[in-house]
């Protein structure tokens, strides 16, 4: 039987797409700009120094994929090691640069319509929408109602929130409503219930996600977001690869926020973990648990590594992003070592979030495709026209019918 491990390095783009100008992202390049900053000494800290060092990702072809994407070699990744897998890059067919669009397209369902957005920087949400939420959730009111950085807004409004019980509502350039509440004074379960109420009321606005942003602490300097974040996404508009796997008796194990992104659709089992190390460890645990089970049931293990995006991309923390990449690279041999002979491993991303770029939003970029396994073609698979090529490849690997979008790059079974 077959087993595949699909890991999304959330926001790890490798070069602006041809249509990036339309998003204000022409020239963005998450990988290249991090590598350039490291080479210039701008990322030297107590935790790391010198050029960006990603030897294991580079052996899978990351450096070559990055250079093929943008025409420039990332400093520290120029040396051409012996490539042990498949490498390439893909552009996005979907209309946006958000998490659901990227993940759904990876699973064969690009978002070809436009999401709804709250574009006003101040007084961002329609009064009638907030009034309906306040009434149903029995709130004393709301705070925020702006475009904001999630870490900054809890510093600015966290004390007032604790004193009044008014939740903090904010948004961004993404199709999203984010709600920040104190875990202890407001309550975590109450925050989740508020997000479910909000999800219902924003459906007519075609908004992709409501995100619960719990935090703790007693002062602006001490406030910090916790790992109890939850995403309340609208379900995919068509069956994804996950649904098709489930419908054919195959197992989909979602690790991290994957289940939330697909609104639970097509997920056999969800495993929650918080932090890069914990998410990789959870992936390894599931790989070890399914060693024997995989002989009886085809299994897709699907992990999202959110820290790259949430902690470093949006916060424009170049040093933190570089160190996290190096930390993941050091964990990669454990993942490769846990693979069975016929396993397939795919590493990719869902969009960019260049930490050197102005603002705090995602960037429209190519994503890397790095693949390892017996049926992975050796070397360069070129520029792919859609993220859905990943889903189509997995559909072929699991012997499913063709998906509506994408072209497989799998080699024939030997």
From Swiss-Prot:
- GO biological process: what's one of them? 5-phosphoribose 1-diphosphate biosynthetic process
EC number(s)? 5.4.2.7
Metal-binding listed as a keyword: yes
Provide the alphabetized UniProt keywords: Cytoplasm, Isomerase, Manganese, Metal-binding
Cofactor binding note: Binds 2 manganese ions.
Cite the Gene3D superfamilies for this sequence. Answer: Alkaline Phosphatase, subunit A, Phosphopentomutase
Q: Where does Mn(2+) 1 bind?
A: 10, 350-351
Give its localization: Cytoplasm
Q: What is this protein called?
A: Phosphopentomutase
């Amino acid at each position: 039987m077959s087993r595949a491990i699909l890991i999304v390095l959330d926001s790890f783009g490798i070069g602006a797409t041809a249509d990036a100008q339309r998003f204000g992202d022409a020239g963005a390049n998450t990988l290249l700009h991090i590598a350039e900053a490291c080479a210039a000494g701008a990322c030297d800290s107590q935790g790391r120094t010198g050029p960006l060092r990603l030897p294991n990702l580079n052996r899978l072809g990351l450096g070559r994929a990055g250079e093929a994407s943008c025409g420039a070699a990332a400093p520290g990744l120029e040396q051409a090691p012996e490539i042990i897998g498949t490498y390439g890059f893909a552009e996005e067919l979907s209309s946006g640069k958000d998490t659901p669009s990227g993940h759904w397209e990876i699973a064969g369902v690009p978002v070809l319509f436009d999401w709804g957005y709250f574009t006003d920087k101040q007084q961002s949400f329609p009064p009638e929408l907030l009034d309906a939420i306040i009434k149903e959730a029995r709130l004393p009111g709301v705070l925020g109602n702006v475009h904001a950085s999630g870490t900054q807004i809890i510093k600015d409004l966290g004390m007032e929130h604790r004193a009044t019980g008014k939740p903090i509502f904010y948004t961004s350039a993404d199709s999203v409503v984010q709600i920040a509440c104190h875990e202890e004074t407001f309550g975590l379960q109450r925050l989740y219930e508020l997000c479910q109420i909000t999800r219902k009321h924003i459906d007519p606005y075609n908004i992709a996600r409501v995100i619960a942003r719990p935090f703790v602490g007693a002062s602006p300097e001490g406030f910090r977001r916790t790992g109890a974040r939850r995403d309340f996404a609208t379900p995919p508009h068509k069956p994804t690869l996950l649904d098709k796997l489930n419908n054919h008796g195959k197992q989909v194990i979602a690790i991290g926020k994957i289940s939330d992104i697909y609104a639970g659709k097509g997920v056999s089992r969800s495993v929650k973990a918080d932090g890069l190390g914990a998410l990789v460890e959870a992936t390894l645990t599931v790989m070890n648990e399914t060693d024997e089970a995989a002989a009886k049931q085809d299994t897709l293990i699907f992990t999202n590594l959110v820290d790259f995006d949430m902690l470093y991309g949006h916060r424009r923390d170049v040093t933190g992003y570089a160190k996290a990449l190096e930390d993941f690279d050091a964990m990669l041999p454990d993942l490769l070592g846990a693979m069975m002979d016929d396993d397939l491993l795919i590493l990719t991303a869902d969009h960019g979030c260049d930490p050197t770029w102005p603002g705090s939003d995602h960037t429209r970029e190519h994503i890397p495709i790095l693949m390892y396994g017996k049926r992975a073609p050796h070397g360069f698979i070129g520029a792919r026209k859609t993220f859905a090529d990943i889903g189509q490849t997995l559909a072929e690997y699991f012997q499913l019918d063709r998906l509506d979008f994408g072209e497989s790059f799998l080699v024939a079974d030997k």
